[in-house]
Amino acid sequence: MQVILMDKVVNLGNLGDVVKVKDGYARNFLIPTGRARRATQANMEAFAAQKAELERIAADKLADAQRRSEKLEGASVTISQKAGVDGRLFGSITNADIAEALQAQGHDVAKADVRLPDGPLKALGEYPVVLSLHSDVSANITVVVVGEQ
């Protein structure tokens, strides 16, 4: 299926690109989330009329993500969790826990922004974590997991 991208989509294309994707990906994800429209003649003309506005919105989103990245870069967040004698946690620290701790510090971070490539944190220590704030902007923070008494 041919679609017009209404936003930058990672590993697919930029705003305004006409790309061919599988029908299910378009029908079940791209179109319902507003990231794409079918590439019909009417939609192509409507997109051409809206292109300047959509580019301005995309630039605003990018500027906001860069501003948030500057505030978050190098930040450290401490999370306490019950742990055993060997340093392994009873439970784990997930991306939702990290996002919640950052929100408590006053940062605007959603749990989908937190990237844990090795899965949840399951031991005490310091961990580097990447926050993907935009498809072009990321911030590196440090998560310190300490044991509760």
Curated annotation (Swiss-Prot):
<keyword id="KW-0699">rRNA-binding</keyword>
<keyword id="KW-0694">RNA-binding</keyword>
<dbReference type="GO" id="GO:0005840">
    <property type="term" value="C:ribosome"/>
</dbReference>
<dbReference type="InterPro" id="IPR020069">
    <property type="entry name" value="Ribosomal_bL9_C"/>
</dbReference>
<dbReference type="Pfam" id="PF01281">
    <property type="entry name" value="Ribosomal_L9_N"/>
</dbReference>
<dbReference type="InterPro" id="IPR009027">
    <property type="entry name" value="Ribosomal_bL9/RNase_H1_N"/>
</dbReference>
<keyword id="KW-0687">Ribonucleoprotein</keyword>
<dbReference type="InterPro" id="IPR020070">
    <property type="entry name" value="Ribosomal_bL9_N"/>
</dbReference>
<dbReference type="Pfam" id="PF03948">
    <property type="entry name" value="Ribosomal_L9_C"/>
</dbReference>
<dbReference type="InterPro" id="IPR000244">
    <property type="entry name" value="Ribosomal_bL9"/>
</dbReference>
<protein>
    <recommendedName>
        <fullName>Large ribosomal subunit protein bL9</fullName>
    </recommendedName>
</protein>
<dbReference type="GO" id="GO:1990904">
    <property type="term" value="C:ribonucleoprotein complex"/>
</dbReference>
<dbReference type="GO" id="GO:0006412">
    <property type="term" value="P:translation"/>
</dbReference>
<comment type="similarity">
    <text>Belongs to the bacterial ribosomal protein bL9 family.</text>
</comment>
<dbReference type="InterPro" id="IPR020594">
    <property type="entry name" value="Ribosomal_bL9_bac/chp"/>
</dbReference>
<dbReference type="InterPro" id="IPR036791">
    <property type="entry name" value="Ribosomal_bL9_C_sf"/>
</dbReference>
<dbReference type="GO" id="GO:0003735">
    <property type="term" value="F:structural constituent of ribosome"/>
</dbReference>
<comment type="function">
    <text>Binds to the 23S rRNA.</text>
</comment>
<keyword id="KW-0689">Ribosomal protein</keyword>
<dbReference type="InterPro" id="IPR036935">
    <property type="entry name" value="Ribosomal_bL9_N_sf"/>
</dbReference>
<dbReference type="GO" id="GO:0019843">
    <property type="term" value="F:rRNA binding"/>
</dbReference>
